[in-house]
């Protein structure tokens, strides 16, 4: 017996939705949701890799931070995917589509210093913050208050991770004394 696949809805195609938002609203909103979904998927993989490979004096605190961050980011992906589907859209899922839609420069494969990993994560979070702010304003202007509210909840968590990453990069650190000569 031959295996057949029947495509029910193309990516980018938006169907009617049970929350009664017009397609003129949901089409641009679902497009923005997919940019964030892709970006959080890429960030999830980056945080997960950092969790696996981090070493050095800050190992334990960074190891735990990367773990909690990739779990939070995974939750964002879930919420965004559910919202996309609820609005009649199709969540991006192929690696090629996710890479195309991601809003930040993805870190190349390899292992980097702890500082560089944190810098890359902060740059990614900041790029995502900018997209969330734009998309929240767009959703509000189109009358999609539910998506705007979802964006605002995610924005607060994303900003909090950015604060923590910036704190890891602070110049005042016990470990700097181990690797830099004392200045008298």
From Swiss-Prot:
Function, in words: Involved in protection of chromosomal DNA from damage under nutrient-limited and oxidative stress conditions. Binds heme.
Keyword Nucleotide-binding tagged: no
Lineage: Bacteria, Bacillati, Cyanobacteriota, Cyanophyceae, Nostocales
InterPro entries documented for this protein: DPS_DNA-bd, DPS_DNA-bd_CS, Ferritin-like, Ferritin-like_SF, Ferritin_DPS_dom
UniProt key word Heme: yes
GO molecular function: DNA binding; ferric iron binding; oxidoreductase activity, acting on metal ions
Domain of life: Bacteria
Self-association and partners: Hexamer.
Transmembrane segments: none
CDD domains in the record: DPS
Record protein name field: Nutrient stress-induced DNA-binding protein
UniProt KW keywords: DNA-binding, Heme, Iron, Metal-binding
Annotated organism of origin: Nostoc sp. (strain PCC 7120 / SAG 25.82 / UTEX 2576)
Gene it is expressed from: dpsA
Family the entry assigns: Belongs to the Dps family.
């Amino acid at each position: 017996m031959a295996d057949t696949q029947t495509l029910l809805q193309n990516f980018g195609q938006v169907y009617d939705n049970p929350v009664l938002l017009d397609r003129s609203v949901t089409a641009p909103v679902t497009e923005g949701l997919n940019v964030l979904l892709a970006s959080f998927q890429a960030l999830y993989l980056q945080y997960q890799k950092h969790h696996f490979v981090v070493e050095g004096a800050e190992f334990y605190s960074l190891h735990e931070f990367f773990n909690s961050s990739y779990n939070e980011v995974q939750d964002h992906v879930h919420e965004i995917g559910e919202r996309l589907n609820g609005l009649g859209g199709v969540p991006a899922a192929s690696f090629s589509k996710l890479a195309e839609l991601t809003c930040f420069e993805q870190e190349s494969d390899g292992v980097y210093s702890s500082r560089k990993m944190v810098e890359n994560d902060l740059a990614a979070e900041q790029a995502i913050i900018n997209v969330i702010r734009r998309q929240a304003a767009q959703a509000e202007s189109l009358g999609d208050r539910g998506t705007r509210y979802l964006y605002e909840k995610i924005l607060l968590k994303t900003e909090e991770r950015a604060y923590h990453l910036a704190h890891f990069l602070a110049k005042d650190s016990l470990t700097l004394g181990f690797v830099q000569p004392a200045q008298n």
